[in-house]
Amino acid sequence: MSKPIQMEKGVKYRDADKMALIPVKNMPTEQKEVLRKPEWMKIKLPASSKRIDDIKSAMRKNNLHSVCEEASCPNLAECFNHGTATFMILGAICTRRCPFCDVAHGRPVAPEAEEPKKLAKTIQDMKLKYVVITSVDRDDLRDGGAQHFADCNREIRALNPEIRIETLVPDFRGRMDRALEAMIDNPPDVFNHNLETAPRLYRKVRPGANYQWSLDLLKKFKEQHPNVPTKSGLMMGLGETKEEIVEVLKDLRAHGVTMLTLGQYLAPSRHHLPVERYVPPAEFDELKEIALELGFTHAACGPFVRSSYHADLQAKGEEVK
């Protein structure tokens, strides 16, 4: 019997090392056959540009992170060229080890106290009008990092009074009430928490998470802040059925969620969960129509849609796909 990996504090574990720590052994760490990408998934990525280099430089200068880079998002160049970025606070090491995600796992260091001020100044320097703030899971913190979110919101608005802030939060497992209380006075303009997949697949896709808990988090935030839109997103192509996705959409509406993102799952490496199916664009269009019929005010649905993809346009209700 092999010895478990002894994690060192502050060290990033990725790919095979990260997957070896998954407690649920119901998937291979390396898939034997990789589905070939269909034509609609083959896009030419934009070349690097001064705008991309400037954003990366600003983040490096202040020791900030973007989920765009840490999670290897395929839309990085497009979003950076558009002048938008999703900042990832509380470090770049996650206490969870979800097998779909490319963010590193490990034992994170203590949050940087000056990060909210650095983030606010960077956003001011970049002249952003809409910003998305997300984080790794921080199960090592008493409030899951919620107070840090609130501090970031406060500092960002102090330097950028006209800005709109969207927060894409973790589930604050076991700390929901404490987390919501921490954010009570400094809520975002859009509150986003992703369900990611159908409840049947949670054990495989989101080990350690709970479907109903995530729904309750969205509902309780909405009850506290009825004028703040709530938002959630799902990945397609992990083995779910269309019927299961429709049921999730109904659950989201029953818990007050009005904004939705649906996108194609892409495996970050051969060590991650494999893509079970590439969902045709027409199916995304059909699900969008269903979502609007169910009462979502905005639904961004398409192969390359991600939860923060053109989030500024999503918040305005413009077409995103």
From Swiss-Prot:
SMART domains recorded: Elp3
Keywords: 4Fe-4S, Cytoplasm, Iron, Iron-sulfur, Metal-binding, S-adenosyl-L-methionine, Transferase
Binding site for [4Fe-4S] cluster 2: 94, 98, 101
Annotated residues for binding of [4Fe-4S] cluster 1: 68, 73, 79, 308
Domain of life: Bacteria
Domain Radical SAM core: 80-297
Main location: cytoplasm
GO cellular component: cytoplasm
Cofactors named for this entry: [4Fe-4S] cluster
PANTHER family hit by this protein: LIPOYL SYNTHASE (PTHR10949), LIPOYL SYNTHASE, MITOCHONDRIAL (PTHR10949:SF0)
Name used for this protein in its record: Lipoyl synthase
Source species of the chain: Aliivibrio fischeri (strain ATCC 700601 / ES114)
